[in-house]
Amino acid sequence: MAHKQIYYSDKYFDEHYEYRHVMLPRELSKQVPKTHLMSEEEWRRLGVQQSLGWVHYMIHEPEPHILLFRRPLPKEQQK
């Protein structure tokens, strides 16, 4: 799978977390489990590449090809 077909959003923030979403090509999205959130090992196996600390935190039912990730902000950046 060519990684250039995977789209990575810009990061966005709230008081506690930074977020990003990752859009998979439709064919690749068929490999996303429907019963659980993916571990880092699972999403890396799909070809998603991002730095350490990101957690797949929510399944977006209407668009399962969009993976939602978050990671805690460093304590000094939290409000």
Swiss-Prot record:
Stated name of the protein: Cyclin-dependent kinases regulatory subunit 2
Cell cycle found in the keyword field: yes
Subunit structure, interactors included: Forms a homohexamer that can probably bind six kinase subunits.
The keyword Metal-binding belongs to this UniProt entry's keyword annotation: no
UniProt KW keywords: Acetylation, Cell cycle, Cell division
Functional summary from the UniProt entry: Binds to the catalytic subunit of the cyclin dependent kinases and is essential for their biological function.
PROSITE patterns linked: CKS_1, CKS_2
GO BP annotations listed: cell division; fibroblast proliferation; meiosis I; mitotic cell cycle phase transition; regulation of transcription by RNA polymerase II
Residues carrying N6-acetyllysine: K4
InterPro entries the UniProt entry points to: Cyclin-dep_kinase_reg-sub, Cyclin-dep_kinase_reg-sub_sf
Gene Ontology molecular function: any one: cyclin-dependent protein serine/threonine kinase regulator activity
Family of this protein: Belongs to the CKS family.
